[in-house]
Amino acid sequence: MATKFPSFSQGLAQDPTTRRIWYGIATAHDFESHDGMTEEKLYQKLFSTHFGHLAIIGLWVSGNLFHIAWQGNFEQWVSDPLHVRPIAHAIWDPHFGQGAIDAFTQAGASSPVNIAYSGLYHWFYTIGMTTNAELYQGSIFMMILSAWALFAGWLHLQPKFRPSLAWFKNAESRLNHHLAVLFGFSSIAWTGHLVHVAIPESRGQHVGWDNFLSVMPHPAGLGPFFTGNWGVYAQNPDTTGQIFGTAEGSGTAILTFLGGFHPQTEALWLTDIAHHHLAIGVIFVIAGHMYRTNFGIGHSIREILEAHNPPTGTPGDLGAGHKGLYDTINNSLHFQLGLALASLGVITSLVAQHMYAMPSYAFIAKDYTTQAALYTHHQYIAIALMCGAFAHGAIFFIRDYDPEANKDNVLGRMLEHKEAIISHLSWVSLFLGFHTLGLYVHNDVVVAFGTPEKQILVEPVFAQFVQAASGKAIYGFDVLLANAGGAAANANAAYMGGWMDAINGVRGSNDLFLPIGPGDFLVHHAIALGLHTTTLILVKGALDARGSKLMPDKKDFGYSFPCDGPGRGGTCDISAWDAFYLAVFWALNTVGWVTFYWHWKHLAIWQGNVAQFNESSTYLMGWFRDYLWLNSSQLINGYNPFGSNNLAVWSWMFLFGHLVWATGFMFLISWRGYWQELIETIVWAHERSPIANMMGWRDKPVALSIVQARVVGLAHFTVGYVLTYGAFLIASTSGKFG
């Protein structure tokens, strides 16, 4: 007899209802809960999945390279990046009538194609690729890499090649390896690629597999390196008149500190980027020798943590400090994952900011739709990672936390004064919410009643002061870098001449610090409200995961439970999973405000109409009317009774996204009993219908659990939200700028 799914849980496999399928899917990746799981097997399984993950990433990159080479227009785009639209891939669709075929035959193609808004063309071009053949080579290389990663994943599951538990628990060696080899060497290797391939290509000198061993990246060779005369590598940089990809205006420097942007490409100088990666690489290689392993030199993390205690007799008595944290972290995968997700979440949000404020890829600053798409993409990923960090933090408290081992240390004391933390977050959220909404609503009322001069408009003077300190001249603050005769400004001019031009937007629209006013002040505080409320829900979920006054034994019920009946006066909605679920709604709300703000402010700048944002962003109707409604007008005319244009696919997705989003509420508002009754009625009808009753169920159909219905509702809400805004963003930007 065939074994029923799921094979990893005999208890579930024997469940006679459809619960078996849904619980099986829900716990497929919860390796800890699987039958016969040991700690060593758990680590080994997770280790192998990392190779599978790398293989998927490699295949994805390979697919992008392949489709651009096969169906794109990379070589034409390279010849004129500012005017040729990059093609992502061809579209073949049997539903296309002649109108759609004509509309999507664009960017010089002879058949329907999609325009690329990924920035991949700019990336490939910047790192030295100029021909389709090079893209194909890259694609094949990535496929080989993926095959190797898959093999490595398989190999490390074989008995002879499974690492031991002790190997996984060796934190010092792992940190040294990650710091020195993964971060350090890869950064230096990337410097090597930039210096040997990308920089010569940017100066019109081809470097490929045929000549890379014979072309010297710098005329002085390695002499200055070995003699310590490193300054030679910074001499003779590219001039401000350099034409990217040609010898015109090119220098010979490979490692510089110019600051600012290349005037033509409006991207960071490649020689600055190479210098940055070399410095980062060297620092990480040094850092990778920090922890004590084989040779008895360096730091022991355990000793560092044990030593970090407040002196005895400290006023306020700060407890046991960091004692016990080494084992707590080292023995909890959820704690480690929480730390990793939190770090990666912050970095991803910073990437969103820096990719547009300081673009590193040639000409990407002028591709406005790509800029908008990449900013939004990275901010959405950031909120997902951050919510995941707190989810695994909560699971740590439920499954891995040992109160005795953490008695009176910083972690134990966090739990002991959780009420103070949660109530402060609550107070901040309430303060921000009432004051920000109060200002917006006041402004709406006075504008509605015809007296816009009565708006409460607050200038963000502190933020303007910070901008001025970094060199922003527009506000007239005579401070630090904005003080033309001051020591700071003189030093800056000597060491990083391009910075002031970049800060003040001297060249083009690529202005590092945008001027800010009352509209920015208000939306900044709206975003602060969203961030603090999301944090409140997530932090409360984690700190209350083990128990609360209402439910002291909560940890015994696990991470996700619907409630413990009516006996305690209402225990629904208080599991750690419910906190995660509620927080995702607030996170989506917040990222919506962040991306609305970014997009509208930039649309106004790109269209040369900054007054629209400045005047309309101070009251809510301005946002609804002049951002959302006005910018969806082109989009919703993508198709109409008279035909369709190349926005049609986005307008259809806009509609479809709304549908998916609205479907979520069907699951979020109705609970399990309704569906169970409905299912039983449908089963009754099925069993009494001729022909239909010839087929039965192997599993008795039952409704989803309360928690599952919530996750289905949340999934629809999230996917619909993303599809709707993604379609709006791309169509409203590309409809104006291509």
Curated annotation (Swiss-Prot):
Bilayer-crossing regions: 46-69, 135-158, 175-199, 273-291, 333-356, 372-398, 420-442, 521-539, 579-600, 647-669, 711-731
Pfam family, one: PsaA_PsaB
S-S bridge residues: none
Keyword tags: 4Fe-4S, Chlorophyll, Chromophore, Electron transport, Iron, Iron-sulfur, Magnesium, Membrane, Metal-binding, Oxidoreductase, Photosynthesis, Photosystem I, Thylakoid, Transmembrane, Transmembrane helix, Transport
GO BP annotations, alphabetical order: photosynthesis
A GO MF label: 4 iron, 4 sulfur cluster binding
Subcellular location, record wording: Cellular thylakoid membrane
SUPFAM superfamilies membership: Photosystem I subunits PsaA/PsaB (SSF81558)
Classification via Gene3D superfamilies: Photosystem I PsaA/PsaB
Cofactor binding annotation: PSI electron transfer chain: 5 chlorophyll a, 1 chlorophyll a', 2 phylloquinones and 3 4Fe-4S clusters. PSI core antenna: 90 chlorophyll a, 22 carotenoids, 3 phospholipids and 1 galactolipid. P700 is a chlorophyll a/chlorophyll a' dimer, A0 is one or more chlorophyll a, A1 is one or both phylloquinones and FX is a shared 4Fe-4S iron-sulfur center.
Binding residues for phylloquinone: W675
EC number, as in UniProt: 1.97.1.12
UniProt: chlorophyll a B3 binding residues: M666, Y674
Membrane topology term: Multi-pass membrane protein
Reactions that this protein is recorded to catalyse: reduced [plastocyanin] + hnu + oxidized [2Fe-2S]-[ferredoxin] = oxidized [plastocyanin] + reduced [2Fe-2S]-[ferredoxin]
Gene Ontology annotations for the cellular component aspect, listed alphabetically: photosystem I; plasma membrane-derived thylakoid membrane
Residues binding chlorophyll a B1: H658
Residues binding [4Fe-4S] cluster: C563, C572
Function: PsaA and PsaB bind P700, the primary electron donor of photosystem I (PSI), as well as the electron acceptors A0, A1 and FX. PSI is a plastocyanin/cytochrome c6-ferredoxin oxidoreductase, converting photonic excitation into a charge separation, which transfers an electron from the donor P700 chlorophyll pair to the spectroscopically characterized acceptors A0, A1, FX, FA and FB in turn. Oxidized P700 is reduced on the lumenal side of the thylakoid membrane by plastocyanin or cytochrome c6.
Subunit architecture: The PsaA/B heterodimer binds the P700 chlorophyll special pair and subsequent electron acceptors. PSI consists of a core antenna complex that captures photons, and an electron transfer chain that converts photonic excitation into a charge separation. The cyanobacterial PSI reaction center is composed of one copy each of PsaA,B,C,D,E,F,I,J,K,L,M and X, and forms trimeric complexes.
Protein name: Photosystem I P700 chlorophyll a apoprotein A2
